[in-house]
Regions:
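Hydrophobic/small residue at the entry helix of a nucleotide-binding pocket
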Residues: 13
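Conserved Rossmann-fold cofactor-binding substructure of NAD(P)-dependent oxidoreductases
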Residues: 60-74
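C-terminal catalytic/substrate-binding lobe primarily of soluble NAD(P)-dependent oxidoreductases
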Residues: 149-387
Length: 387
């Protein structure tokens, strides 16, 4: 039976999610936005790349709870493709309206608050899965896949990143999503597992060189939030769990300098009798420099795991690479981010995921994702080598 899936937000990821659900399921998609022009542009693009028989649209303000509740009366699943600050309120609306929900997360503290509503979600008969997407999201699911392949897993190292195919100096990066989300990843600290215990690790630390075939050498560094709640879930199961973000060489030194200057701060400062928030000022300047419009991109991911397989000590490598698709005009980042959350939305609509507020690592099995990824022509290579 076809379900109704509401996508809140008609930007890059909203378009990608709508495309994938329409292409790979029989469910109805309702895409919504507060801005009619953005919505019209999204519908026009979606109509050009997939059959839109099951697509409709709605104008709604995500902050207008009464309008949202009215819209949710006939919905089965919400896909939140809006910034993370709206997700906690949306979770409350989802539970109140008895509508399941998935979101793109981006802030672990908010995700924790969402997961604390597990009993409320169970009572409402709904499924809430926050922090989907590429990372956190797909990277976690791929790490879960590693634990499913090995008989016993001791260590997991993850590195992933979305990069422009043709980097522009000096930052060698293009903006593929909200700049606030980018700075949030570059600020605060990450949480890893070391000797089976949760440790706090500062952003931009542990910079190392990682090589990929046909791409060359990249720099991997610690950024925040990439593992979401996975360290807490696996603290009694893994000795080591780490996640780093990939960038072209030189990028991290610039970002470290900006942070040292205080440009990531949200604390107001007085300049010529004007109150200025450094982070807002920084975003206003840098966003224009990093937003290169529609550019061809590359997404890379590597899961390196150590453990036991058939009584032998082995190293397991799961490599994935994705490129911009000229036929659909979907970037690699849009595909990996949007399709991970759309796969979860479809799984929920098909009643394949239990009720409650569930973390990504507990919601979606690695092999289930691998099967769905193959249907979407993901380029994933799995290699096991005896130590």
């Amino acid at each position: 039976m076809a379900k109704n899936i509401l996508i809140v937000g008609s930007g890059r990821q909203g378009i990608s999610v709508a495309y994938d659900i329409l292409k790979n399921s029989k469910h109805n998609v309702i895409i919504s936005d507060i801005n009619q022009e953005c919505l019209d542009q999204a519908i026009s693009k979606i109509s050009g790349i997939v059959d839109t028989t099951n697509l409709s649209n709605a104008i709604v303000d995500v902050q207008d709870s009464q309008s949202m509740l009215k819209l949710l009366e006939n919905m089965d699943v919400i896909v939140s493709a809006v910034p993370y600050e709206f997700n906690l309120a949306l979770t409350d609306l989802a539970i109140k309206s008895k509508t399941s929900m998935v979101d793109l997360g981006g802030h672990t503290n908010i995700v924790r608050q969402q997961l604390s509503k597990n009993q409320q979600a169970i009572s409402a008969g709904v499924t809430i899965v926050p922090d989907c997407g590429m990372g956190p999201g797909m990277n976690i699911t791929m790490a879960v896949l590693a634990t499913e392949i090995l008989d016993k897993t001791d260590e997991i190292y993850i590195c992933d990143g979305g990069l422009p195919k043709d980097p522009n100096p000096p930052w060698n990066y293009s903006l593929f999503f909200n700049i606030e989300g980018l700075t949030n990843e570059y600020d605060e600290q990450a949480y890893f597992l070391k000797d089976g215990k949760i440790v706090e690790v500062p952003c931009f630390s542990g910079i190392e060189i990682v090589s990929f075939d046909k791409i060359g050498e990249l720099e991997a560094a610690v950024t925040s939030g990439g593992l979401s709640t996975m360290p807490w879930t696996f603290k009694d199961k893994l000795k080591v769990l780490e996640n780093k973000t990939l960038r072209y060489k030189g990028h991290w030194e610039w970002m470290k300098a900006y942070r040292e200057l205080g440009l990531f701060s949200r604390e107001s400062i007085n300049h010529d009798n004007n109150e200025i928030v450094p982070r807002n000022f920084y975003h206003q300047l840098l966003e224009k420099k990093l937003d290169h419009g529609r550019v061809e991109d590359i997404c890379l991911m590597r899961i390196s795991a150590k453990g036991t397989k058939d009584t032998k000590q082995v190293n397991l490598f799961i490599d994935a690479v994705e490129f911009y698709d000229k036929e659909t005009d979907l970037t690699a980042m849009e595909k990996w981010t949007g399709w991970h959350i759309s796969i979860l939305a479809i799984q929920i609509a098909d009643d394949k995921i239990e009720k409650g507020a569930i973390s990504v690592e507990n919601a979606l099995k690695g092999h289930t994702f691998l099967e769905e990824a193959k249907k979407r022509n993901y380029n994933i290579n799995i290699d096991i080598k005896e130590i």
